[in-house]
């Protein structure tokens, strides 16, 4: 039997006979989310236990977190989805963020963060390729000038040491370093979102694309802005959920059969 529900929050319009467990899940979903998530509904048609597990994860790892507000969780989920190129998943969380009162400028802040983190991830190869570049005796700029800029970055960010990939980038291409700093200034300067939330979302994005050095930098900045370990834990739970959930959002076409 095919299903053609196209949105995350959908009304039941097909003649399925639901079990008591699925009816209980639906009632709870409507009271907390405003409707039944499509993927849980589809899973329940095939296997109730899988649907129950998905609903448990949705509640315990995502919208049931206690220390980051639901609006920020939804914006974070959207940003993580965008960082991983998951358009359909991003739309799901965009709509949830709207339901929780997110303004369009907050949506744009979250999109900007995702873009910054994904672009910054290209620096992950800089330390590896630096020896190859050095063999050619190519210098991007005067070492004194580079060191001045790096010292300023370290002072302004209050970091004990600069990321190795950033230092390598400066040696490989002064122009790319300058571009990175321009992007950082623009994309990590929010319209209305708090700077703390910007760094928490950036941390989640970096974790999701598996860029440890980037994640370390943004987590440090998050703590400097007053973030807590509990909020960090919420972000890690959410990132784990959204990362694994990609398999289900990609499988909705299969589950509709």
Please provide the spans of the model-predicted regions.
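"Short basic amphipathic alpha-helical interaction patches in structured regions
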Residues: 90-98, 127-128, 217-220
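Structured core of small recognition/catalytic domains
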Residues: 189-228, 241
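Short alpha-helical scaffolding segments that buttress acidic/His motifs in well-ordered protein cores
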Residues: 54, 58, 75-80, 110-117, ...
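Short, thiol/selenol-centered motifs that function as redox-active sites or metal-ligating centers
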Residues: 76-92, 121, 201-217
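C-terminal binding/interaction regions
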Residues: 112-116, 125, 143-148, 227-230, ...
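Helix N-cap / loop-to-helix initiation motif
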Residues: 68-71, 101-106, 193-194, 226-230
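Acidic, glycine/proline-rich low-complexity segments that act as flexible tails and inter-domain linkers
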Residues: 3-70, 122-197, 219-224, 247-257
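Hydrophobic/aromatic-rich structural module bridging two neighboring secondary-structure elements via a short loop
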Residues: 93-117
């Amino acid at each position: 039997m095919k299903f053609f529900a196209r949105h995350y929050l959908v009304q039941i319009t097909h003649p399925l006979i639901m079990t008591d467990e699925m009816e209980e899940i639906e009632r709870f979903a409507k009271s907390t989310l405003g409707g039944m998530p499509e993927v849980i509904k589809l899973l329940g048609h095939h296997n109730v236990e899988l649907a129950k597990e998905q609903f448990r994860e949705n509640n315990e790892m995502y919208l049931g977190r206690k220390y980051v507000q639901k609006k920020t969780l939804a914006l974070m989920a959207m940003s993580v989805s965008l960082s991983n190129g998951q358009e359909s998943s991003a739309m799901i969380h965009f709509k949830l963020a709207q339901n929780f009162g997110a303004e369009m400028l907050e949506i744009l802040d979250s999109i900007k963060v995702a873009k910054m983190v994904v672009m910054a991830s290209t620096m992950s190869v800089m330390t590896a390729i630096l020896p190859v570049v050095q063999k050619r005796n190519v210098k991007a700029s005067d070492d004194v000038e580079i060191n001045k800029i790096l010292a300023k970055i370290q002072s302004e960010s209050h970091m004990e040491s600069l990321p190795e990939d950033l230092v390598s980038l400066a040696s490989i291409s002064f122009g790319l370093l300058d571009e990175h700093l321009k992007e950082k200034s623009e994309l990590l300067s929010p319209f209305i979102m708090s700077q703390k939330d910007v760094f928490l979302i950036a941390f989640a994005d970096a974790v999701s694309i598996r860029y440890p050095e980037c994640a370390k930098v943004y987590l440090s900045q998050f703590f400097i802005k007053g973030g807590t370990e509990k909020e960090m834990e919420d972000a890690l739970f959410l990132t784990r959920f959204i990362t694994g959930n990609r398999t289900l959002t990609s499988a909705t076409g299969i589950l509709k059969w």
